[in-house]
């Protein structure tokens, strides 16, 4: 198996393990992902991780190999809303534990921290992320701000904090990123 295949298999194996203890990774453990659906927990995690920059309908069609009974965008949104943020934190943590980090000169971790802003789906009713129309945007836009910890030698993300665009506070985000949480 090539290294990329090992990485992908490892990722899918972690998601498979997670699917056996859903209560830690969903918002309502008593009812979320209990019934059999086309977009079960494993497929949702696989789909979200493998999505590219296409429209949601295109991504769903690709994921389900252009099957005529592909789930709708609405079904995707409903299932996605059941996932807890802890599912992705756990996946990142477990994945990083499977591949030890490289140390610079055998004893140091070189870690960078940087922020980025991302536009998200427009929703003028969300005051925490919506930015009013201005000279650059005629209809306004919604945005989130992320702060990431990145280990330079291993070329891996260790931790991430997401904040609503209008409430961004890089200093607070940096303080909430914990090297310990990243398992360095």
Residue ranges of model-derived segments:
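Conserved, well-structured functional cores that handle cations and Mg-NTP chemistry
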Residues: 1-181
């Amino acid at each position: 198996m090539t290294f990329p295949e090992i990485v992908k298999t490892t990722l899918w194996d972690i998601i498979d393990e997670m699917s056996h203890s859903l209560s830690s990774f969903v918002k309502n453990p008593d009812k979320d992902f209990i019934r059999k659906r086309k977009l079960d927990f494993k497929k949702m995690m696989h789909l979200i991780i493998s999505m590219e920059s296409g429209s949601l309908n295109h991504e769903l069609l690709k994921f389900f190999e252009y099957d005529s009974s592909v789930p709708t965008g609405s079904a995707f949104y409903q299932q996605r809303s059941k996932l807890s943020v802890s599912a992705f934190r756990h996946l990142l943590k477990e994945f990083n534990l499977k591949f030890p980090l490289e140390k610079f000169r055998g004893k140091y971790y070189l870690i960078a921290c940087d922020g980025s802003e991302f536009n998200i789906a427009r929703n003028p009713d969300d005051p925490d992320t919506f930015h009013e129309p201005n000279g650059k945007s005629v209809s306004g836009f919604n945005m989130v701000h992320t702060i990431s910890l990145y280990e330079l030698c291993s070329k891996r993300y260790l931790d991430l904090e997401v904040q609503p665009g209008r409430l961004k506070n890089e200093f607070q985000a940096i303080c909430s990123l914990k090297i310990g949480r990243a398992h360095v």
